Amino acid sequence: MYNFCIYFYLHIRYVNVSLNISIINVQMLKFTSINKENPSKVESKVRSKNFDEIYANFAKQKAEEQASRCSQCGVPFCQVHCPLHNNIPDWLKLTAENRLEEAYQVSSSTNNMPEICGRICPQDRLCEGNCVIEQSGHGTVTIGSIEKYITDTAWDKGWIKKIEPTINRDQTVGVIGAGPAGLAAAEELRKLGYKITIYDKYDRAGGLLIYGIPNFKLEKEIVIRRTKLLEDSGVEI
């Protein structure tokens, strides 16, 4: 009787493990049945009348579907080749599972401006260009568009709050230059409780993001929204 119980227990464990492995394999192989899709592009006859952004955002269902194409590689080359080493597989998985607020928390933990990077980073040479399923001929995961979708949704849902340091310090820090590096530095220093003043020769903060990138690629309101968040957090520009 004892031997039978042991056998029965091991058999059940084997079946459960096998089922779990099968489920995981199906989840990791979705790229074989779901084709790569990019967000829709505004028609040229409409684009010719303005300088607005030319790509739409993913719909919720489409973003989850495209995020589910990530195979969760053992060695995530997308992350390796990202200059910020963003935790890309993690927030893709969370997006696929409709855990979008958590996806935003992971995305923003290594990136001060994910919605901007999602729009202007050369993903074809970095994360997407080194996606393993791209190398196997299935088409890369649309990482940049999903990154943009996550943070734009976070703004719409009110998940992005002004910085409230746990401690306010008496020391002041001056940041020279209001470009993306200066804005990111100011944000991190403000989180530590320092009083921050950013100095720039131009009348608007953003640097290259404002003065060097056209609206059809990055609308100015996206950058202004970020600088306003810093000002609301106590950063002086």
Residues of each region from the PLM?
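Ferredoxin-type iron-sulfur electron-transfer modules and their immediate structural context
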Residues: 19, 23-172
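N-terminal Rossmann-like dinucleotide/flavin-binding domain of flavoprotein oxidoreductases
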Residues: 104-111, 146, 209-237
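Residue-level detector of alpha-helix initiation sites
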Residues: 112, 179-180, 204
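N-terminal Rossmann-like FAD-binding beta1-loop-alpha1 element of flavoenzymes
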Residues: 172-196
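Glycine-rich FAD pyrophosphate-binding loop
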Residues: 194-210
